[in-house]
Amino acid sequence: MAELGELKHMVMSFRVSELQVLLGFAGRNKSGRKHELLAKALHLLKSSCAPSVQMKIKELYRRRFPRKTLGPSDLSLLSLPPGTSPVGSPGPLAPIPPTLLTPGTLLGPKREVDMHPPLPQPVHPDVTMKPLPFYEVYGELIRPTTLASTSSQRFEEAHFTFALTPQQLQQILTSREVLPGAKCDYTIQVQLRFCLCETSCPQEDYFPPNLFVKVNGKLCPLPGYLPPTKNGAEPKRPSRPINITPLARLSATVPNTIVVNWSSEFGRNYSLSVYLVRQLTAGTLLQKLRAKGIRNPDHSRALIKEKLTADPDSEVATTSLRVSLMCPLGKMRLTVPCRALTCAHLQSFDAALYLQMNEKKPTWTCPVCDKKAPYESLIIDGLFMEILNSCSDCDEIQFMEDGSWCPMKPKKEASEVCPPPGYGLDGLQYSAVQEGIQPESKKRVEVIDLTIESSSDEEDLPPTKKHCPVTSAAIPALPGSKGALTSGHQPSSVLRSPAMGTLGSDFLSSLPLHEYPPAFPLGADIQGLDLFSFLQTESQHYGPSVITSLDEQDTLGHFFQYRGTPSHFLGPLAPTLGSSHRSSTPAPPPGRVSSIVAPGSSLREGHGGPLPSGPSLTGCRSDVISLD
């Protein structure tokens, strides 16, 4: 029970990081707040406290409270008998400093044997930094050194010192480049790098959390923070080498000091190193890539045959493969086609553009398959070099099953440019030219403005005026009907329209008028109707009522200047009305005669002369109807 209480005391002193490590070691869920994690850890301790879990708790506790090394004076204090003072005179016991009370003394003599101090981290671990393509290492100023946590404080601090030899100093000074209007820069630089303290493989740059660096007492600028991926996440900096040449003392006699502050993380140590490097450009790397040579084209042909080989298990067989000769980065024709050895595709990208892109922002990712394509794995494709040299007028090729290729030239389709449609006389003239009118027919046409003194907007080309005498036939009226026109006293009226010029037949025949089918089909019973006769004319504005009695017409006759007959719009309906009235109504009384104007045929058929009908009205003159 005493041992269980001690373990419980250790668990309750853990932070969130220790609780998560303990629960992860035991295979439990390690997500949640601190009180939830603590409850899970205590439940683990009570339910199944295996020896491995107990050892893990003790290990975490030793790391949480590292044992302080005691000096001779501290050991003499602990070896004094109880009740005695350090000077040996009797008196009250002097309190022992809390820092001298190690975890072993707090747990008792039984557990002191089990408590061992953590193994110290090596000062210079066997850490190897991953080489950078744009930097050539000239020398190592500080070997990879461990940034180990030395106390239980949240923030750690470490001090480092390095010095430059006269030869190194001379290399830096001779590489100085001063550009007009810009600050001086050095091609050979003093470079500071951070990484994880791991010896399994070459390490990439990795910044500790909350990193601050001072070089010779001056704060060193670091890369800016990246935008957080989620709310509440701790901002991080992009890990990359730091150029500390502007802050270094360029002297062979005065050393340089570096002070590093960072936040410690449980179970994770970091390493620091300083190098003397020479910065390279994209052009230099391209020359080095060319110096490596061009890959044999047979390798690419073998890859093509492998891709186009028919798979017996697949129902779809690929017989050809299209590849573009345009770079996916710059959308331009390839100059130096290259790809990584780890890429499984044939599509290449331009080496110069790829190196320039990574010089600005080193990602080293293939633009085709988005996989890692480091500089060391880049190769120049010899087959694509042959294709680019032999085919300069195409941007796409097609590979066959045997490894051969053929250019894919774009099909040039003759596209007829349709001019915008013209309106009015311009459109008519343009259509006449397009239809190939003979030169002798292209005479100057007399232009007549149809909008002058015209009241009709629906007619494009008005026909010539013709005088059409209209007659009407009397039909019997209904008994007691009122409002019919009488046949004996119906006065004649003239439909008046403004004077308009007429168009010659030669002009109408020369115009290329097209036949347009009707948008809506008309029935057989209304195809003979003259729809223009239903338009409103002056007689409808100023004349009396269409159907009225003889007495009322005589009474109101002096108020109207013009009197017109309604035959121009009731004519088409007269045959139908007449037949119905004859069959259903008797003859009208002799004292009162009603009639409806009804021509024998449609107005369109009667343009040439009088229409045949029944007896005409007495004292009625022919009406002049204009078809405008």
From Swiss-Prot:
GO molecular function: SUMO transferase activity; zinc ion binding
Principal subcellular localization: cytoplasm
Tissues showing expression: Expressed in kidney, heart, spleen, brain and cerebellum; weak expression, if any, in liver and lung.
Keyword Zinc part of the UniProt annotation: yes
Family annotation (SUPFAM superfamilies): SAP domain
Residues covered by the PINIT domain: 115-280
GO biological process, one term: negative regulation of DNA-templated transcription
Impact noted for substituting L141A: Greatly reduced interaction with STAT3
Location of the protein in the cell: Cytoplasm; Nucleus; Nucleus speckle
Chain positions of all zinc fingers (SP-RING-type): 312-393
Post-translational modification: Sumoylated.
Residue ranges, annotated region (Disordered): 571-628
Involved pathway(s): Protein modification; protein sumoylation
Spans annotated as Interaction with CCAR2: 1-200
Annotated region described as SUMO1-binding, given as residue ranges: 450-460
Reported effect, R143Q: Abolishes interaction with STAT3
Domain SAP: 11-45
E.C. number(s) listed in UniProt: 2.3.2.-
This protein's record includes keyword Transcription regulation: yes
Quaternary structure and partners: Monomer. Interacts with PLAG1 and ZFHX3. Interacts with STAT5A; the interaction occurs on stimulation by PRL. Binds SUMO1 and UBE2I. Interacts with AR, BCL11A, HMGA2, IRF1 and NCOA2. Interacts with MITF; the interaction inhibits the transcriptional activity of MITF. Interacts with STAT3; the interaction occurs on stimulation by IL6, CNTF or OSM and inhibits the DNA binding activity of STAT3. Interacts with GFI1; the interaction relieves the inhibitory effect of PIAS3 on STAT3-mediated transcriptional activity. Interacts with MTA1. Interacts with CCAR2 (via N-terminus). Interacts with TRIM8.
Domain topic, free-text comment: The LXXLL motif is a transcriptional coregulator signature.
Protein name, as recorded: E3 SUMO-protein ligase PIAS3
Species of the source: Mus musculus (Mouse)
Gene: Pias3
